[in-house]
Amino acid sequence: MINTDDNLLMIEALLTSDPSPPLLPANLSLETTLPKRLHAVLNGTHEPWSYAIFWKPSYDDFSGEAVLKWGDGVYTGGNEEKTRGRLRRKKTILSSPEEKERRSNVIRELNLMISGEAFPVVEDDVSDDDDVEVTDMEWFFLVSMTWSFGNGSGLAGKAFASYNPVLVTGSDLIYGSGCDRAKQGGDVGLQTILCIPSHNGVLELASTEEIRPNSDLFNRIRFLFGGSKYFSGAPNSNSELFPFQLESSCSSTVTGNPNPSPVYLQNRYNLNFSTSSSTLARAPCGDVLSFGENVKQSFENRNPNTYSDQIQNVVPHATVMLEKKKGKKRGRKPAHGRDKPLNHVEAERMRREKLNHRFYALRAVVPNVSKMDKTSLLEDAVCYINELKSKAENVELEKHAIEIQFNELKEIAGQRNAIPSVCKYEEKASEMMKIEVKIMESDDAMVRVESRKDHHPGARLMNALMDLELEVNHASISVMNDLMIQQANVKMGLRIYKQEELRDLLMSKIS
C-alpha cells in the first residue's frame, strides 16, 4: 500500500507546478478526501489565504429548494501571526465577558451539533489567556456553518450558477457586492474573497490581503475538486473575469444545518500535512489516491498540444487502492423514524434536534430578527409578543367604547318604542319637520331644519345640540309666514357621528 503522505505531496506539487493544462483527477470520493484537498489548497499556494470553505449542493430543509450548504472548512488565520499584538489589544478593548461567554456557548453548541465532543482547537502553551479566545475572523468562519445560498444568490451561488469564478478584492468591492455575508467579512478585515465553482460545489477562499490570482490557479483548484472546464488567460480586471454584475442584492438566508461536516480550526497555526500534526483531519476508510512515479515526469516539459497523450500515459499508472476495513464501522443510526432513543447520548441528540426545529419555527414567525444567535432570537420574540399584547389591549378598548355607544342607542330606541303616544307625536312631527345633515369634514357638520314656528323649535334645536355634545360655531334663524328655517354649523367633540346617525338623533330629540 502506497504511503498517504506521498499522495499529499503529489497534490501539493500539482498546485505549485508551472502553468499548463492540469491532469485529470483519479476516481476518488470527494467526501472522504475533502479535508485533505482543502489543506492542499491552503498549504500548496503562495497566497496568504485565511480559510478555505467548500459549499456543496443540497436541499433546503423547509422549502426543498436546491441550495449550497456548508460541506467542510479549514481555518489558518492567514497573516494573523504578524498582527497578534494588534489583535490582542483590539480584543481587550472590544470584547466583553458577556460577548466571550456568548461566543463560547455558540461554539459548544456547534460542536455538540456536529459530533457531541470538545471542539478540536490546538492549545498554545506559550501564549497568554487572550490568545485562546476566539477572534472576529474565527467567529466569522464558525458562523459560516449556518449559511446557505440559493440558486444565483450570494457570491458562492453566483459562481455555481454561472460556472465562472467570482473574485472581489478591496473594501469597496466587498461592501458593494450586495452580499450580506461578504459585508460581514469586510467588517472583520477581509480584503479578498474568491469563489471557484466545480461540478461538486464551490470552493471559497478569503484573505486579509488583496490578491489577484491568475486563471492557471483557478484551473488547478477546479481540477483538484473535480472540475473539467478550464479558463484561458489571466484576467486584467474583475469585469473581464466575471461577466455578470455584483450589484444585485444577496438573497442568501441563514438557516440551521443539522448535520454539517466538522470544522478544522487551529489557533494561531497554519495547517500542514506533516504526520506530527495533531489536527490533521484523516479521511475515513475509503479510497486512497496514488499517482505513481510517472506523475513527476508529467510536470516537466509539458506541451498543451500533447495534453491528450499525457492523459493516456499517466492515467493508467494512477492506482486506486482500498484500505482494509478493520471491522464494522461504529456509528449511530439516524434518529428519523425511531420513537425511543437507544441510550442517553442519543436521547440528548434527539432533544437538541427537536429544540433546533422549534427555534427554526420561531424564526419563521418573528418578522424582524436582529442577529442569528438564539439569544437575540428569543429577545426579538419577546419584543414581538409584547407588541402583539399592546395591540390586543387597544383593540379591546375600542371594542368597549363601541359597545357603550351601541347600548346608548339601544336605550334611545327602547324609549321610543315604549311610549306609543310619543311615537305618534314623533311621526306627526317628523311629517311637519324636515332635517338635513351634511358632514363637511371629519368632525364638522352642517344642520338645516325646516318646521313650523310653533312650540319654540329654535330652543329645541339648541337643546338637542347640547345633549349630543356638539359645539355650535354659527347659527341662523329665518321665518316666512308659518315656516321657520334654522341653519347651524357644528363641530363634533369626543363622539364622531355619521350623517344618518346624527340626523336620526336630532329628529328624535327635536320632535
Curated annotation (Swiss-Prot):
Cited PROSITE patterns: BHLH
Keyword terms, alphabetized: DNA-binding, Nucleus, Transcription, Transcription regulation
Alphabetical list of InterPro entries matching this protein: AIB/MYC-like, bHLH_dom, HLH_DNA-bd_sf, MYC/MYB_N
Domain bHLH stretches: 339-388
GO cellular component, one term: nucleus
Cellular compartments annotated: Nucleus
GO MF annotations in UniProt: calcium ion binding; DNA binding; DNA-binding transcription factor activity; protein dimerization activity
Top-level division of the source organism's lineage: Eukaryota
SMART domains registered for this protein in UniProt: HLH (SM00353)
CDD domains recorded: bHLH_AtAIB_like
Induction data: By UV treatment.
Pfam (any one): HLH
Any GO BP annotation: hyperosmotic salinity response
Disulfide bonds listed in the record: none
PANTHER family on file: MYC, TRANSCRIPTION FACTOR BHLH28
Subunit structure comment from the entry: Homodimer.
Identification of the protein by name: Transcription factor bHLH28
